[in-house]
Each structure stands twice: as structure tokens, then as C-alpha cells.
Amino acid sequence: MKGLMCAKYDDLVGNLQQAHGEARKWWAINSHNELVELFVNNENGAWTIIITRSNDPISCALIGGDNSGANYDIDSTVEMKQ
């Protein structure tokens, strides 16, 4: 995952929570057995998607944005089967 913002899972999630006010709103396991998560700040609409490999303690922020305008008052999970 070269060129991405990567850190230990707890450090990356802690930064999203503390510095950006984002909380996990959705997660899924993809076909490569990687954890994909969406973090959202409900006040300003900022969001970040991170990915974590099952065999690696490092997580990477794939993409993020501001003012999405969507309602993230959800708590859903999806597990994709191989």
C-alpha cells in the first residue's frame, strides 16, 4: 500500500477520532480478507475510508473527503464471502 497514509491500526483510528472527530459507521470484509472501514464526522460531513490487511497490523487511509451531505446515522456491517 505504497504512497498511502499508513500507521498502526490503533494510532490511525485514534487520529481519526481525536483530530478529526470521526467515528466508525460501517465496515466490511472484502474478497481479500481485508477489513474496510468508513469513518465519518457527523457534524461536518468529513469522511475517511481505511483498509487493514488480516496479516498486517498496519492500516492505510485510502480516501477521504469533506461535506458529503449523506446521512450516516447507521450502524451496518457487510461481510463479503470469497
What is the predicted function of each stretch?
Residues 1-82:
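Polybasic/polar functional segments that serve as interface/processing modules
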